[in-house]
Amino acid sequence: MRAPFFLPHLWRAAVLTLIALSALSACQERSGAPGSTRITLLNVSYDPTRELYNDFNAAFARHWKAEHGQDVRIDQSHGGSGKQARSVIDGLQADVVTLGLAADIDAIARSGKLLPLNWQSLLPDNSSPYTSTIVFLVRKGNPRAIHDWGDLAQPGMAVITPNPKTSGGARWNYLAAWAWALAQPGGNEASAREFVRHLYKNVPVLDTGARGSTTTFVQRGLGDVLIAWENEAMLALRELGSDQFEIVMPSVSILAEPPVAVVDTVALRRGTREVAQAYLGYLYSEEGQEIIAKNFYRPRDAQVAARYASQFPQLKLVTIADFGGWASAQRTHFSDGGVFDQITAP
């Protein structure tokens, strides 16, 4: 039986620590050395992909065994996307990274020099095999009558969202809110800044990652609304039931494109590069795209997307290009002393 996705913080932290230690221990040997009958990969991923990669890893292991006669085990490490990127830069031996946004893999390429700067061009769709967007999860009956972004800045509203300094999903949340404010009559950078400032005044706690915020909202019962990845909100309905929560689709959201990459320096040293490349490539296969859709991420493959069209409502979406790309957005909003720091300063 699959464990509940809203595991308590301490239990979850202990599990992740054990996984990381196990993976680091495994990295002491050349996992993919010629003649190996078993190979081990470490996938360092962002917070709410546990269920997706639990299913995908099993499928890829079957595929690789059938094609190559070799057993493969994929270990997972999960956390806020920015925090995970920092762990890889600081030495966590990831063969692949599957993070929440391109800026975090850019940081690994620039600061860690662990993969090429053109990593995004090495796989289809800018190395983003699935997409998502940002929605609201509210309690059944929507008792606070939350319908759009403007409601989240009302006095007395309790909004749950993670910390953009550590969480990729939180940065998508922030930018979606900013985009809505810009789209309002007379909207401009000053009015967007003021709106987002009021919204974050209503946030009682900033968890480090999206799954932590989900736990805060659904298990601890804090908050009136959770700003969430669409897949995370849909998972909550599946796991906990539509009798407890419901999803509200805002009038404007953002196209979130979580990227993936092989960490070349690590994979070459460990002899796992061929398997790591195949692993990420299999995300684009029909089976991979089916698993993606079943786990509530929006698939890239047109035929698979058509089969799941009723699962994913159409939304007005801005893109990161509307913010000048991730390098510009990161520098303006999320760098030390950036807009987020300014509007949340005491």
Predicted features by range, described:
Residues 27-30:
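Bacterial signal peptide processing site
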Residues 184-251:
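Ligand-binding pocket segment of bilobal, Venus flytrap-like solute-binding proteins
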Residues 141-147, 166, 179-187, 266-274:
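Short helix-loop capping/hinge motifs at secondary-structure junctions, enriched
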Residues 134-142, 257-274, 291-295:
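A bilobed periplasmic-binding-protein/Venus flytrap-type ligand-binding module shared by bacterial periplasmic
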Residues 34-167, 309, 344:
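N-terminal segment of the mature folded domain
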